[in-house]
């Protein structure tokens, strides 16, 4: 009897120490996507403007406009998406004649705020990197270096929180960010040179 009691205690301990990381996936995906999107889209926009205009003010203003527009867009998109999910879950509970537990339902406002905040957190990195560097080439280099470090951190953070392989995650995020910046810079430079 003592042995079965100790086995039960061990099972309870095992259950309490086991954590289902898949439950984190929804908010983790939204946070990483928002921050990564803010980082890459703002940096790419700044690189594109920097390809044709060497003026620091133009680069910073374009990055700031991109940050504000992107944060608003992400917030609205997340609000609409989560509100649709909310409506579906409420309708299903009503069909099943189940008492609606509001605290278990997703919050569209929280999701919108979190998405806008995550986007802004990512977007601020290239803005700060460019803001204090007057010389054109050094400004471009500082944006690329700051974005590279941030992409690696975001990739590692996403992997660590989701208990996934960190190197692969960081490499994937880094390659995607570099590709976006290179394509934007290259195409804008080409259009600027040939006046297309």
Curated annotation (Swiss-Prot):
It holds the Pfam family VIT1. InterPro entries: Ccc1_fam (IPR008217). It catalyses: Fe(2+)(in) = Fe(2+)(out). One of its GO terms (biological process) is intracellular iron ion homeostasis. Expressed in roots, leaves and inflorescences. The keyword Transmembrane applies. Its main location: membrane. The keyword Phosphoprotein does not apply. GO terms for cellular component: vacuolar membrane. It is found in: Vacuole membrane. The chain crosses the membrane at residues 32-52, 60-80, 113-133, 140-160, 173-193. Keywords: Ion transport, Iron, Iron transport, Membrane, Transmembrane, Transmembrane helix, Transport, Vacuole. Induction: Down-regulated under iron deficiency. Induced by iron supply. Residues 1-31, 81-112, 161-172 are cytoplasmic. GO terms for molecular function: iron ion transmembrane transporter activity; manganese ion transmembrane transporter activity. Residues 53-59, 134-139, 194-196 are vacuolar. It is a multi-pass membrane protein. Belongs to the CCC1 family. Vacuolar iron transporter involved in the transfer of iron ions from the cytosol to the vacuole for intracellular iron storage. Involved in regulation of cellular iron homeostasis. Vacuolar iron storage is required for seed embryo and seedling development. Can mediate sequestration of iron ions into vacuoles when expressed in the yeast ccc1 mutant. PANTHER family: FE(2+)/MN(2+) TRANSPORTER PCL1. This is Vacuolar iron transporter homolog 2. It comes from Arabidopsis thaliana (Mouse-ear cress).
